[in-house]
């Protein structure tokens, strides 16, 4: 399986989970390293756009393609098991992710996207023994269409 993420070109050649460990994220509190990825390039793009400040900021990013072999174990947080309006409650989602990641039972945690609930993000646990089987396939520049930043009249 190939998964995708955008990262600053300074860090696009490494898989460490340091950024999420330092800052926390949707599914992890600070202190727990994790590498956030998405099942498609378009979902990875939506995830990064939700947090981007400007087109100039995006132009510093590269698209990473990460190869996860089929032998890697996976655990899933299912949408139907989450409480109503879970996507507004960072404490709740961080607790859910922490429960899985801290036990170190799996190298891969499948979670619903808070933006597109029917699609999935994959959290890679760099502390799991099977992490060594996961490989960075490529890191390439990505063209972010300027229309993404035009003011919309809706």
Regions found by a protein language model. Name each.
Residues 15-28, 35:
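NAD-dependent ADP-ribosyltransferases
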Residues 2-16, 29, 57-154:
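Active-site and NAD+-binding cores of ADP-ribose-processing enzymes
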Residues 53-55:
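Short proline/glycine-enriched turn/loop segments at secondary-structure junctions
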Residues 27-47, 51, 123-127:
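Extended catalytic/binding region for NAD+/ADP-ribose chemistry, centered on the ART fold
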């Amino acid at each position: 399986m190939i998964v995708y993420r955008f990262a600053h070109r300074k860090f696009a050649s490494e898989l460490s989970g340091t950024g999420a460990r330092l800052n926390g994220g949707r599914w992890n509190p600070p202190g727990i390293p994790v590498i956030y990825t998405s099942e498609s390039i378009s979902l990875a793009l939506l995830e990064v756009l939700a947090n981007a400040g400007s087109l100039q900021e995006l132009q510093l990013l590269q698209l990473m393609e990460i190869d996860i072999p089929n032998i890697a174990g996976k655990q899933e947080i299912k949408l139907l098991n989450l409480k109503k309006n879970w996507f507004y409650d960072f404490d709740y989602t961080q607790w859910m992710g922490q429960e899985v990641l801290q036990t170190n039972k799996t190298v891969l945690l499948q979670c619903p996207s808070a933006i597109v609930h029917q699609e999935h993000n994959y959290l890679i646990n760099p502390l799991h023994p099977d992490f060594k089987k996961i490989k960075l396939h490529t890191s390439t520049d990505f063209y972010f269409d300027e229309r993404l930043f035009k003011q919309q009249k809706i």
